[in-house]
């Protein structure tokens, strides 16, 4: 765990832990150069020696960094400092779609359509840039306090090329597409 107050890359002050995923912890931070709050995703220590995890982590940053869209969480920076691999992203104050559904229960048709349109807009922008997400699930969708829906966590995203064939099953077991589960060819349709 990263200590509060540590400064990464001589720029990003870690303020407090705000979340955790399978391979990284997420902290609220402050960009001291631009004087704004950010989210700092730090690769868990048990994975820092694993080249595959480090590559996967950097791949997320590279895949998402080129995507500038109101329905995608922006990635600002990626780096390594004191043995910590980190990614700096837009801080979205809100909750995941999973948490939102758990709190609200059944959503109205109007609300469901609004969320779906915003998700599709973000995913469509990624596809237009040649990126497939490969892990779309409620935990990777954030709803901000003002109702803006944003796609996040491009951890297993991949550039769409003729080599976008995987022999490994990727994605979350409950949400993965059949072709991904079989280790087959993944393309934009896998996100739908």
Name each region found by the language model.
Residues 15-21, 26:
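Protein kinase glycine-rich loop
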Residues 30-37:
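Conserved N-lobe loop of protein kinases adjacent to the ATP-binding glycine-rich P-loop
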Residues 44-66:
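AlphaC helix of the eukaryotic protein kinase fold
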Residues 78:
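Activation-segment/catalytic-loop signature of the eukaryotic protein kinase fold
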Residues 82-96, 100:
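Conserved short submotifs of the Hanks-type protein kinase catalytic core
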Residues 115-116:
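Activation segment signature within eukaryotic-like protein kinase domains
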Residues 119-131:
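Protein kinase catalytic-loop region centered on the HRD/HxD motif
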